[in-house]
């Protein structure tokens, strides 16, 4: 028997995922002594003494059987002679020392686990019907964290001191809720209230059951959740969905739906093995699936009526679906007969989602009938992530947010020691910060042509800088376009910190992103076809659809689509008839073109006419996306 001492340093997603209790239980079962320590922003340290074979077994178990929601990026091991200083194995108090060169991996929000779902529906459970139940393996993380290390005082659960019973489990290393920072119960935790759109509190012995009844009756309800707020209504009838569209002034954009369970989803549509794996993962994103493949094959009444499906995703062959990921979702489906609920973000189109109860109720009273809101602060809002499979095997992000943020991407190259902020483009923006060879992306922000979204971007970036312990970044980058609000925002940050500002050509940014995503070595050059829309070119002209040759640092434009003359500037991006006129105006007889366009609009209340066709101004813009839209528009007009 050979006794040894081992010091193990583990980095990755090892905080807020039950990693320390896991190590504690294994070490105790192997009769090892020592400790496991949360290093705050630098991973977890494990120091153990005991038989060498038992220590090897501990390391093997950590590598191969750690909690499913954890992720080990590095495991460094140092052997030494035992010092016989430990009587037992303990979980030590987290370190509060911040290391400027540390590589923190911050935990995303995690869907409710099966054990907590059982607690939710088991009558003898202390958490029976409690809509905020969680444990060390599940529940909100990123949306509640205010600082590191990830301990309860550094979350919004600071507002809810634990009762004696909850504290007993919280301090017991063998309990599933040991150091579960968001744990609580009916007696000590957050609570919901139900209010109508006139501000009247709805009294009920079970307000969640009452909310489900209201939805069954066709009501539209705002429901505050883990990291944001949804507007919900039923799917068994298309009328409430059409009412929601009318009130939200969202005539065509699709809604997402939350399906009761996996078996119900499989009655609605066919999903492959990978789609099922993603849908049921602890990340629980929205997945775009075929809208009709299930119903077309069913000889029985479809799970969701065809009229409702068309109202949910008008004119589309796919639909965004997700499964319940929070306790409140399971409780709502427990009390409703609906197979699915429409869930759309609680915000006006193009604006950040509302997360404060009073703002939710003030701003949405003309859209919703009732509000189900709670008193736990959401420190960082995050929309539902959206994933789509390409070729049935390759999942790609349409939107990266809840469940994935703030996990970093690896980034190798001579710049990996630099701390750089990226503020993103104008459309579908996401901020990012590089540190220690990682790129930490913020949650999805949206279009930054609104000042409210710039404020959201600023808040998200500042929060990430704080968590990463970056007091002064080395540089900041923005889009080359001089008139974007995000460009102005970057200029202000550069001036505030007195750091360089780098203006990046939009399509070169796409090229560099492909290299990062593919882990292509930094000294490589690639040929990249950017089948993208408008980008401000290095020659101060509009670019779109380039063939670029380049690397991380720069690129050369070797070719691209022929410049097309689009009418009315940015209105061509809204009214396809304008761009079609720009392309075909000099190539087609006027009468034939007018016949093709029919009653198409070129402005909110203006249809195409011969006179208008004669006077439309032409503004040059090269844009591959508009060209594809024009082709689609012609195909639509000809059918």
Task: Locate the predicted segments by residue.
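Hard-cation-handling environments
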Residues: 487, 549, 588-639
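Short glycine-rich phosphate-binding loop at a beta-alpha junction
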Residues: 222, 470-483, 501-502
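Glycine-rich phosphate-binding loop plus the immediately following alpha-helix
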Residues: 256, 370-375, 441, 447-454, ...
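Glycine-rich phosphate-binding loop of actin/hexokinase-like ATP-binding domains
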Residues: 384-409, 525-581, 585, 625-628
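Conserved phosphate-binding catalytic cores of ATP/NTP-utilizing and phosphoryl-transfer enzymes
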Residues: 266-271, 331, 353-362, 384-385, ...
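Intrinsically disordered, low-complexity, mixed-charge
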Residues: 1-182, 186, 190-193
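Internal gly/pro-rich beta-alpha loop/helix module
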Residues: 65, 169, 336-414
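A phosphate-binding glycine/aspartate-rich beta-alpha loop in the early core of alpha/beta enzymes
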Residues: 220, 228-293, 305-307
């Amino acid at each position: 028997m050979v006794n040894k001492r081992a010091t193990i340093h583990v980095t990755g997603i090892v905080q807020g995922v039950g990693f320390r209790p896991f190590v504690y239980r294994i070490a105790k079962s192997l009769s090892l002594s020592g400790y496991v320590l949360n290093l705050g922003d630098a991973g977890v340290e494990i120091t153990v003494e005991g038989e060498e074979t038992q220590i090897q077994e501990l390391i093997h178990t950590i590598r191969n059987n750690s909690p499913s929601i954890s992720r080990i990026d590095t495991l460094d091991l140092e052997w030494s002679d035992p010092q016989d200083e430990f009587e037992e194995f303990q979980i030590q108090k987290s370190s509060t020392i911040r290391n400027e060169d540390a590589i923190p991996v911050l935990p995303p929000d995690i869907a409710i686990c099966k054990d907590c779902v059982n607690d939710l529906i088991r009558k003898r459970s202390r958490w029976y019907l409690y809509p905020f139940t969680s444990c060390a393996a599940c529940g909100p993380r990123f949306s509640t964290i205010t600082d590191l290390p990830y301990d309860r005082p550094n979350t919004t659960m600071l507002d809810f001191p634990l009762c004696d019973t909850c504290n007993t489990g919280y301090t017991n290393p063998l309990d599933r809720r040991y150091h579960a920072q968001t744990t609580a119960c009916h007696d000590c935790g957050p609570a919901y209230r139900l209010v109508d759109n006139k501000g009247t509190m709805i009294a009920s012995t079970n307000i969640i059951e009452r909310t489900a009844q209201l939805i069954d009756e066709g009501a539209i309800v705002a429901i505050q959740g883990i990291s944001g707020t949804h507007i919900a209504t039923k799917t068994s009838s298309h009328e409430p969905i059409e009412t929601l569209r009318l009130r939200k002034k969202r005539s065509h954009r699709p809604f997402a739906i939350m399906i009761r369970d996996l078996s119900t989803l499989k009655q609605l549509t066919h999903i492959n093995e990978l789609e099922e794996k993603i849908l049921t993962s602890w990340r629980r994103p929205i997945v775009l699936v075929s809208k009709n493949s299930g119903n077309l094959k069913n000889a029985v009444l479809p799970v969701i009526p065809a009229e409702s499906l068309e109202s949910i995703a008008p004119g589309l062959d796919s639909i965004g679906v997700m499964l319940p990921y929070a306790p409140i979702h399971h409780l709502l489906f427990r009390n409703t007969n609906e197979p699915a609920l429409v869930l759309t973000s609680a915000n006006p189109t193009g604006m950040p989602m509302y997360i404060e109860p009073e703002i939710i109720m003030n701003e949405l009273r003309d859209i919703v009938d009732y509000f189900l809101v709670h008193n736990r602060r959401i420190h960082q809002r995050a929309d539902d992530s959206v994933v789509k499979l390409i070729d049935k095997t390759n999942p790609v992000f349409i939107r990266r947010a809840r469940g994935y943020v703030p996990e970093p991407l690896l980034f190798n190259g001579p710049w990996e020691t630099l701390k750089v902020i990226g503020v993103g483009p104008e459309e579908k923006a996401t901020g990012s910060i590089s540190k220690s060879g990682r790129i930490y992306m913020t949650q999805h922000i949206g279009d930054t042509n609104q000042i409210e979204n710039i404020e959201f971007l600023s808040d998200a970036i500042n929060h990430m800088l704080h968590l990463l312990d970056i007091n002064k970044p080395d540089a900041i980058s923005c889009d080359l376009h001089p008139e974007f609000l995000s460009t102005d925002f970057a200029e202000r940050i550069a001036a505030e910190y007195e750091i360089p500002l780098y203006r990046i050509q939009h399509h070169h940014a796409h090229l560099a992103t492909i290299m990062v995503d593919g882990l292509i070595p930094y000294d490589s050059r690639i040929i990249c076809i950017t089948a993208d829309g408008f980008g401000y070119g290095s020659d101060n002209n509009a670019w779109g659809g380039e063939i670029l040759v380049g690397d991380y640092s720069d690129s050369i434009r070797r070719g691209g689509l022929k410049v097309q003359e689009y009418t009315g500037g940015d209105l061509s991006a809204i009214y396809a008839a304008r761009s079609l006129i720009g392309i075909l105006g000099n190539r087609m007889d006027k009468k034939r073109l007018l016949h093709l366009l029919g009653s198409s609009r070129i402005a909110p209340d203006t249809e195409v006419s011969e006179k208008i066709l004669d006077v439309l101004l032409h503004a040059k813009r090269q844009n591959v996306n508009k060209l594809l839209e024009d082709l689609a528009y012609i195909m639509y007009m000809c059918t």
